[in-house]
Amino acid sequence: MDNPQPELPMPFPAQASDMPLLPARMVNEYQYCPRLAYLEWVQGEWADSSDTVDGRYRHRRVDKPGGTLPEPADEGDGERFHARSITLSSARLGLIARMDLVEGEGSVVTPVDYKRGKRPHVARGAYDPERVQLCVQGLILEEHGYRCEQGILYFAESRERVPVRFDEELRALTHNAISGLRFIAAGGQTPLPLEDSPKCPRCSLVGICLPDEVNFIRDEKIAPRPLAVARDDALPLYIQARGAKLSKKGETLEVSIDDQKIQTVRLI
């Protein structure tokens, strides 16, 4: 289970002068997994996966700046605008975000965040980490004088736009994630990994985080899960025999016991 215990709301402290601005993406990571956010934000760890590479490829268009974000206009004034790849920050909130797209008219704006993959069929239209990241963008836009009541998540593979309202519940969840990230960053102690979570196998930092290995050391009753294979066209090779030896010969792997070959496996 990820975290079955209820969470108490954290206070939203003022930004310390010596603390760097928190990127919206890191608030997303904290909501997804506090340990992942700590490894990336505090320790500077990073590893690519097929998902992250594909995500960058799909973002290549929206990452190119285009259009301008005008100053907030009076109600009913101003033309509709689209501004791409806009970076805004708030010193008061201690936040910074690069927004894929901001749509607006006058003082009313809507941030649009592009995501790879298809829209998930869940009650709120999207998972909390993505909703929180979008809400951070809305909070920053409000700090700059705009009215921002909702955002849009655009899922590239299914080509669907999912509206996300910035209601009080989502705002509270977002403030709690911001405070939680600041708390663990200031604490200097790596959070424990999730336990038996389906989030871990596809995480790009699973080889650095080692969730199952760390949990097994902490409690031997927690059995390690089978290896997660990054490629769906390949299979893992398990060798459990005592005294077995693995060697590579050309494009094959050979398994032997007492110098007697017992298995040959072709590499893909």
Features from the language model and the residues they span:
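Short, histidine-centered active-site or binding-site loop motifs used for metal coordination
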Residues: 114-118, 155-157
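Metal-dependent nuclease catalytic regions and adjoining charged, substrate-binding loops involved
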Residues: 2-13, 92, 124-125, 140-226
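Short amphipathic alpha-helical face segments that pack within enzyme cores
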Residues: 132-139
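Metal-dependent nuclease catalytic cores that hydrolyze phosphodiester bonds in DNA/RNA
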Residues: 1-111, 118-122, 132, 223, ...
